[in-house]
Amino acid sequence: MAVHTDIHPNDLKAFLTRYSIGSLLSYQGIVEGIENSNFMLYTTEGKFILTLYEQRISKDDLPFFCNLMQHLGRRGVPCPQPVIQNNGMMIGELAGRPAAIITFLEGEWVRQSNIYHCCEVGCSLAQLHLAAQDFSLSRRNTLSLVDWKCLWKRCQVRKDPLLREFGKKIDTELAFLEENWPSILPTGIIHADLFNDNVFFLNDRLSGIIDFYFACNDFWAYDLAICLNAWCFEHDHSYNLIKARGLLESYQKIRPLVPLELNAIVLLARGAALRFLLTRLYDWFNTPPGSVVVKKDPWEYWHKLCFFSNVGSLSELGF
């Protein structure tokens, strides 16, 4: 979450008349995150989250995201629910941006994960995958392998010295992944961004999953590989086998991986590291001036990419 677009109090009050969530008491921007502008709303009926969808999010995709959250919520996945307007619509417009209000989830995201958090994430990710099997809508992954090359070219336009540090390795990785990326694996809805700041906990128990705005149809095992990147490294860039084993075993108690997935998981983790390296690089150079947003360090994913590109066996991942 972040704030790229500010809103005027009078415009917000007028927008809220479309809902039955009480009168506005106060609101504040949420700094954490990258993609959209987010605000905490305090009304006479409680707390809510207002999201203004910025340029990377297509308005055409919003029904997919909102209906997916509804679908998952009905199947017991703890995620925010879109608040319906009085006219029955989920999406409105505010400050020239598509906008929606979702319910507020209790809990906090953890800055330093432990084995219990990783086990909870593994279990919940598998439950999410299974709960979405009968979801009727679909969406292409707009940040899949085919898109990484274009993203890298857009980064290189900047001619920044930082890019010279990454350049040769990224070119090599892109070529390798294009040559070896799997074409047939179990597929369904994936979250695609299940990082620690998108998962809430209460007393080490998972209480909510948020930010479904990268959700799409892709390999389930790729979603798991993203979680290995997001949850199983320490601040010194070392890979924590205990956390990884807990995450993987908890996932497989709900949905065991098939042999094809096991054979591909190292490659998928390598690809996931490259994906987040590239998006962080792009955002590092292209965050608009004046945005209230904390930019995320690309170097973190450089180290992860180097780790996964040198993994030689499943045991090194925690299997």
UniProtKB/Swiss-Prot annotation:
Gene3D superfamilies: 3.90.1200.10, Phosphorylase Kinase, domain 1
PANTHER family: AMINOGLYCOSIDE PHOSPHOTRANSFERASE DOMAIN-CONTAINING PROTEIN, AMINOGLYCOSIDE PHOSPHOTRANSFERASE DOMAIN-CONTAINING PROTEIN-RELATED
Catalytic reactions on record: L-homoserine + ATP = O-phospho-L-homoserine + ADP + H(+)
Keyword ATP-binding: yes
Native organism: Bartonella henselae (strain ATCC 49882 / DSM 28221 / CCUG 30454 / Houston 1) (Rochalimaea henselae)
UniProtKB keywords: Amino-acid biosynthesis, ATP-binding, Kinase, Nucleotide-binding, Threonine biosynthesis, Transferase
CDD domains registered for this protein in UniProt: HomoserineK_II (cd05153)
InterPro entries with a match to the protein in the record: Aminoglycoside_PTrfase (IPR002575), Homoserine_kinase_II (IPR005280), Kinase-like_dom_sf (IPR011009), Pseudomonas-type_ThrB (IPR050249)
One function term, GO molecular function aspect: homoserine kinase activity
Classification via SUPFAM superfamilies: Protein kinase-like (PK-like)
Any one biological process term the GO annotation gives: threonine biosynthetic process
UniProt xrefs under Pfam families: APH
NCBIfam families on file: PRK05231.1 (NF003558), thrB_alt (TIGR00938)
Family (UniProt): Belongs to the pseudomonas-type ThrB family.
Pathway terms, separated by semicolons: Amino-acid biosynthesis; L-threonine biosynthesis; L-threonine from L-aspartate: step 4/5
Protein name, entry field: Homoserine kinase
Documented EC number(s): 2.7.1.39
Domain of life, source organism: Bacteria
